[in-house]
Amino acid sequence: MSATELKAVEEADEWRTAQAQFDEAAEIIRLEQWLREVLREVQREFTCHFPVKLDDGHTRIFTGYRVQHNINRGPAKGGIRYHPDVSLNEVKALAMWMTWKCAVVNIPFGGAKGGIIVNPRELSPNELEHMTRRFATEISILIGSDRDIPAPDVNTDGQTMAWIMDTLSMHIGYSVPASVTGKPLEIGGSAGRVEATGRGVTICSVAALEHLGRAPHQTKVAVQGFGNVGSISAKLLEEAGCTVVAVSEDYGGIYNPLGLSIKRVLEYRAREKTLKGFPGAQEIGNQELLTLECDLLVPAAIGNQLTSRNARDVKAKLIVEGANGPTTPEADAIFRERGIFLVPDILANAGGVTVSYFEWVQDLQSFFWSEHEVNQKLKAILSRAFNEVLKTREERKLDMRMAAYVQAVSRVAGATRERGLYP
């Protein structure tokens, strides 16, 4: 394997990235060796291979994972994703990132993640439901409202969560709405949950612009990824006064240096099921979007998009990570060297888990808040977290990512230290 090929393999390993980020934070805060050993590994990793009968009568074996990184600050929390590229290492990294994400915004959860190796577009609605319910049964020994609370992630949604919640409820004989979050409103979901991650990205973006002394109306934005997070981020950033010049989906995107009307883009995509052919815009590739002339770049698609191969070509002076792990350590080092201000994923996209926390609290109380209340509480928590990380950055002379990690790792280490080792 050539040096170039080896580097590409290294940069593609999210678990290596997650551990490297933790190691750096642990070194900065001089974390005790025993705590380093505890926190750099996951607490539980569960792999299952389970059969599902397809519509044509054949049986297919699926592979699924559920990983819990740390539960010393509370029940585990993390999404379930359906994707053909799901791997155990990816799920482990995402579980670790969830631990830090919950800690940096100071909500009482640990980190978890789950996934199934599948392209859900290849399954009928009936097959998708059967697969989901069987997976829920397999992981039912791990999940529950006081143990591990799943949520939607890549290619999963409120319907997926409804099936999981119903499956768990049928097993025990009564409804357990707090066992999952991101549910439809009719069965205990929270107002504002669908928009929460994108709203959090917007809150952090506006706070970062204010810190940098730049007004939203002076800001051109490029958003990679136009799913739930990307589309809502683009819409809310436009409402905040920014000019969105580019958006993209998995196959590519559209660009207009004078700005796109996100309302019209959303209407066009809903009608045509694609961004291709949107009038008044030129088609661009996903990688091309990352290096466009813009002030704010929001990578909101998948991991490992900003690497050593394109980091020097990024023209934005502000990056706000809507996706999980979109930047490799190699790219991070280049951005630090270039003085690019980056708001890390564990802070920038924590809006989703924060409102999931609100949903869990509302379910346990059977008392629900208005969307305005949810949004106000979300803004208060994320604004406080942003300012705490900014203060740590300035006091310790760090970048925002490492400041967020120092904040998060310190909190989790403190809880672990107080609880001690059993037995």
Task: Name each region found by the language model.
Residues 93, 149-151, 174-180, 223, ...:
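General beta-strand structural signal in soluble alpha/beta enzymes
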Residues 1-191, 414, 421:
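N-terminal ligand-binding/catalytic initiation module
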Residues 23-31, 96-103, 121, 133-145, ...:
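Generic secondary-structure signature for well-ordered alpha-helical cores
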Residues 5-13, 208-209, 312-423:
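Adenosine-phosphate binding glycine-rich loop
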Residues 184, 189-293:
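Glycine-rich phosphate/diphosphate-binding loop of Rossmann-like nucleotide-binding domains
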Residues 13, 17-20, 30, 45, ...:
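Conserved active-site and cofactor/substrate-binding residues in soluble primary-metabolism enzymes
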Residues 252-342:
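Rossmann-like adenosine-cofactor binding region
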